[in-house]
Amino acid sequence: KSFSDNIYRNINGATLQPVLDTLITLKQSGVWLEVTNLLIPTINDDMQMIRQMCRWLVDNGMTDNPLHFSRFFPMYKMRNLYPTPLDTLLQARETAIEEGIKYVYIGNTSDTRGEDTYCPHCSELLIKRDYHQVKINKIAGTGLCPKCGTEITGKW
């Protein structure tokens, strides 16, 4: 929920390093890995922190692993906050792409701009989603871009 150890400790009551170590262990073990980051306004939605997290993912060989930015809604102990603005999610997505993450998605929103999968080589639309439904899947069964042949990492 944060790339800051202080924030992670305050929100989760735990430290960040074991999470990072686990991500590295899973990656090295060949386990399919996707990272989800719930963006909480005023807590962990700082673009510098998001950029730092993305750089860590890139530096640790996770450019092909999907990164999901999820929208926060006020509940339980955080009812005083507001929902994550859509612009924040889109900016986080763009930041991650700029840093080299190939598959970046936004979720927990009805906006579909950050749901689709594109080929990182030729930008061909590969998977078209509408909220939680797949409308088009051009790589099912092959894991290859039909336009340029690039292998798309994942479980197909």
Predicted regions mapped to residue ranges:
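Short linker/helix segments within small regulatory modules
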Residues: 132-142
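Residues immediately within or flanking Cys/His clusters that coordinate Zn2+
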Residues: 116-117, 142
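Conserved AdoMet/S-adenosylmethionine-binding subsite of the radical SAM
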Residues: 1-84
